[in-house]
């Protein structure tokens, strides 16, 4: 068997998330269908293993998955073959033959997510599926100061949605940047960490927006982290503004 790592982008608007669900259009099922078509529909079907799940409406710029296939194709042939089958809202950017010990989920070292907030007076119909909307003035310095308290290793119980299957809510956030995109009239958040809990990024964004709009004090992060109480960070930002930007494996896994 030959193991391939694929790096791909998708528009999450018309997907019910990444993970396979009965009678739902998902990214995982769509990829699985394409891979099994290339492999001439073996039994049992070939699974596609992603680096992690994204929810309905969440996008990806560089999601990663792997699969094992009984036929050898060059990297470029595999990329082109998949793209010839896949719908237009998924694009395979790179296909790589890798060692069999590579695992899209367990080999990952860190991930980066981006969240885009449109600051227009009204919702832009052409951006509504790709940003969230917050028209009120935001103090970026206050949000940056608060974000510093999220960086590091913490128990993020207050920032995880119900339904999480994680065994531990301890995660490490390495970096958070908050910038204003003057051209697009957006505020852009980037979060890099060793992994993120269910809805964690969207909850943190909503929390920081409350601080930036003076609905919370700047030092509220520490209090809420220590409390380990989800009701203290009650809001969740919409899925439409969230993007998986990068999955870092720390090494070059591609085989010659």
Swiss-Prot record:
* Keywords in alphabetical order: Isomerase, tRNA processing
**Database matches in InterPro entries:** PsdUridine_synth_cat_dom_sf (IPR020103), PsdUridine_synth_TruA (IPR001406), PsdUridine_synth_TruA_a/b_dom (IPR020097), PsdUridine_synth_TruA_C (IPR020095), TruA/RsuA/RluB/E/F_N (IPR020094)
Question: Molecular function (GO) terms listed?
Answer: RNA binding; tRNA pseudouridine(38-40) synthase activity
List its EC numbers: 5.4.99.12
Gene3D superfamilies membership: Pseudouridine synthase I, catalytic domain, C-terminal subdomain, Pseudouridine synthase I, catalytic domain, N-terminal subdomain
The question of whether tRNA processing is a record keyword is answered with: yes
Instruction: Quote the catalytic residue positions.
Output: 55 (nucleophile)
Q: Which domain of life is it from?
A: Bacteria
> Could you confirm whether the keyword tRNA processing appears in this record?
yes
Reactions it catalyzes: uridine(38/39/40) in tRNA = pseudouridine(38/39/40) in tRNA
| Single biological process term from Gene Ontology | tRNA pseudouridine synthesis
- Report residues binding substrate: 113
* EC category: isomerase
What this protein is reported to do is described as: Formation of pseudouridine at positions 38, 39 and 40 in the anticodon stem and loop of transfer RNAs.
The record's similarity note reads: Belongs to the tRNA pseudouridine synthase TruA family.
Quaternary state and interactors: Homodimer.
Q: What is this protein called?
A: tRNA pseudouridine synthase A
Q: Lineage, please? A: Bacteria, Bacillati, Bacillota, Bacilli, Lactobacillales
User: Gene name, please?
Assistant: truA
């Amino acid at each position: 068997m030959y193991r391939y790592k694929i790096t791909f982008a998708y528009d999450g608007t018309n997907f019910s998330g990444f993970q396979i669900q009965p009678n739902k259009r998902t990214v995982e099922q769509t990829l699985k269908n394409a891979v099994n078509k290339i492999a001439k529909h073996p039994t049992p079907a070939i699974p596609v293993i992603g680096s992690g799940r994204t929810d309905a409406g969440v996008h990806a710029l560089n999601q990663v998955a792997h699969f094992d296939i009984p036929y050898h194709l060059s990297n470029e042939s595999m990329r082109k073959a998949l793209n010839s089958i896949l719908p237009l809202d998924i694009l395979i950017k790179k296909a790589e033959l890798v060692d069999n010990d590579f695992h899209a989920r367990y080999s990952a070292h860190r991930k980066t997510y981006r969240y885009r907030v449109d600051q227009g007076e009204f919702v832009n119909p052409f951006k509504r599926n790709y940003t969230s909307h917050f028209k009120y003035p935001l103090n970026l310095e206050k949000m940056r100061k608060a974000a510093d308290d999220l960086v590091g290793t913490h128990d993020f119980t207050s920032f995880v949605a119900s339904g999480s299957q994680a065994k531990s809510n301890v995660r490490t956030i390495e970096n958070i940047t908050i910038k204003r995109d003057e051209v697009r009239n957006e505020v852009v958040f980037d979060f890099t960490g060793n992994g993120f809990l269910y809805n964690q990024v969207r909850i943190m964004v909503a929390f920081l927006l409350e601080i930036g709009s003076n609905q919370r004090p700047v030092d509220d992060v520490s209090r809420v982290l220590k409390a380990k109480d989800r009701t203290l960070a009650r809001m969740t930002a919409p899925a439409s503004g969230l993007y998986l930007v990068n999955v870092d494996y720390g090494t070059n896994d591609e085989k010659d």
